[in-house]
């Protein structure tokens, strides 16, 4: 296939509120990378970024520094891209079909990695080209501050640090303001913005709903694997952690932490934080409830100002549990062997009690998949959907498709992302003979429909009503996509204690990197 490319000194060129930017045109898309939407001093609120000359927006910008250097991990399952890191990371990328006045729906991607890792380009599947080109949408992805740079409460040390515990969230809002003010020049509709994200990115969507400063900046939300109680808010003062850092670094005052080299700051944090965290102290790295962010809606009420915003919320069958299924080769197991494996993992009494419920909820799955049903995501997501359905429209989905890798593996955390972006061609393990093309189109079209209308219904899937407080109307996406109301309610209630205990032995939430 022949590709087309163009990039001249003055085209494609867009004048933004910060200054002019020049991108490039590739295969029918105008692409802009690394556009600064803000700048900020360490621990302080973001301010608008401005420049005088035309900004070259043809390559990705810096990503936020991490507390530990990333290393390749599970690349066959979740292919990664590693990039240059710097604290000047407030930048965004745009893919658009044309620089016109078409007012296309806008999708703003919030990356995963909890609140302490990841970037807008960390995963190969995050690329926005296919979504923009095939879906006729404007796609935006953003970088923002993370970890102690973005979520470290120093409010005890003065008003200038009042919201340091949510500086990363403040960056996201600055990016959404930039989108509101500029996206029309890129062919997008500032009145039709969907924020969507997976894992930590999905959690950031739920956080925005609880943040008054975000009101009016987005109109729909997609939460993918983003409701997980073990990534809870940071409550209490961050003073103890800050004082421990100052002592470790020999810093005279809190202002000195603003200028110490990041590598030294991160090393000191990694040294002092574990003991403080074990003692129940606030060590940052997740949002800090205050007047800016009003807290987890499962612990507090949904804000009435955002209670009617349409949401699409769901999880993946195996999430993190599925990463433990290496070499199982379940395709070669007999039914008796599969049940024996479940008994080995969960104990015979527990397996005997759960398997009938499991087969009723997931008849297409082997009994060997039961230990890999990730209830730590599914159960809080079910609660979130029920609570949200009391106030506004919410649709439930569940990614249920087995993969052929290693003799058959339940879907894992992030395995749905290539389907959402129509990027399975970039992720070899996502290609399932006879399944992927149709499944990818079903999921992709649901996202496109939701971004346009606030309803994921389209002609390629069964009728999909919104959920109610009494009935979770879940669309199970797999080779035989179907609507499954309350399909696993009894199973999750029964399985939660046993599978949670199994996961607790095998999964450390602080290890999340996707």
Q: Which residues does each PLM region occupy?
A:
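Substrate-access "cap/lid" subdomains that shape
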Residues: 181, 215, 224-338, 367-386
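Serine-hydrolase-like catalytic core of hydrolytic proteins
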Residues: 72-254, 300-323
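Non-catalytic accessory segments of hydrolases
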Residues: 1-166, 190, 430-443, 452-461, ...
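Mobile gating loops/cap/lid regions near enzyme active sites that modulate substrate access
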Residues: 35, 69, 378-514
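C-terminal, loop-rich substrate-recognition/catalytic regions characterized by aromatic stacking residues
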Residues: 44, 306-354, 479-514
